[in-house]
UniProtKB/Swiss-Prot annotation:
It comes from Salmonella gallinarum (strain 287/91 / NCTC 13346). This is UDP-N-acetylglucosamine--N-acetylmuramyl-(pentapeptide) pyrophosphoryl-undecaprenol N-acetylglucosamine transferase. Transmembrane segments: none annotated. UDP-N-acetyl-alpha-D-glucosamine binds at residues 15-17, 127, 163, 191, 244, 263-268, 288. Keywords: Cell cycle, Cell division, Cell inner membrane, Cell membrane, Cell shape, Cell wall biogenesis/degradation, Glycosyltransferase, Membrane, Peptidoglycan synthesis, Transferase. One of its GO terms (biological process) is regulation of cell shape.
Amino acid sequence: MSGQPKRLMVMAGGTGGHVFPGLAVAHHLMAQGWQVRWLGTADRMEADLVPKHGIDIDFIRISGLRGKGVKALLAAPLRIFNAWRQARAIMKRFKPDVVLGMGGYVSGPGGLAAWSLGIPVVLHEQNGIAGLTNQWLAKIATTVMQAFPGAFPNAEVVGNPVRTDVLALPLPQVRLAGRDGPIRVLVVGGSQGARVLNQTMPQVAARLGDTVTIWHQSGKGVQHTVEQAYAGVGQPQHKVTEFIDDMAAAYAWADVVVCRSGALTVSEIAAAGLPAIFVPFQHKDRQQYWNALPLENAGAAKIFEQPQFTVEAVADTLAGWSREALLTMAERARAVSIPDATERVASEVSRVART
């Protein structure tokens, strides 16, 4: 490396599944002396979160096109052109050696702007099915990486960068050794919650009685309703919280997780080494199903598509897993994980910047 520090622009926005992996890579490279800036949108979570991590952020105006009316679709080319022009001006000022696209609407115009300026584009696809933006950008990218096999036919599988506190958890055989008593079930619907989990799990608790103890993240604004649902079936002892700030501590507590299967959730559960019941969000491209499938194939998880996520099916599944079976599943989950995903992505960014 020359005397001048290398410069990276991270393009990621919208959801934690895009932003948190980008932050992990950014911090890794900043620790090596890189200068990092972020490209995002002013009305999504990155606007608040990224500056809290000590990273400067620039904004462009762009939003998704899916589900919009005809008027919005007709205006889309002009909106994309304007966003491309904004991104291009930002990159001309910052002069990054490489840009890293981690997903979200911002990556499209940002990637095109970088390509038009001759700046190498590195892509990371977090999901088992590639999003539309990354499908387009892959044609102009210098390098494409994927978290799960199958999103792109020839891309290297590098996993998803996950938070260091999750990676620091003791291995399952250490963490779960000597545990007895009720099976500890962690229910996580994401920050928005998941209605199907909130409605079904209190009934599951009623069936399983004192063989389980549940910690249930309900999502915003429904904690009291979910608490009442548990109390209404004679199970008021279970813990319900709106959010869980320290997910690593929650994973450390749990014997099994019941949750959606967003890319980052699946990767964190594998890294922690936890068995899971996954309930994929119903989306036309079945993205969350494909995210969870490698863990089910490894014997570390069970997938219930939402129509099959019934009280009977879930209660029977949980009742059928002994502590020995759960430990075996936990070890299989950990074996599938790629704990050095952050280093792999950062290493590829560094390689591209040198060439």
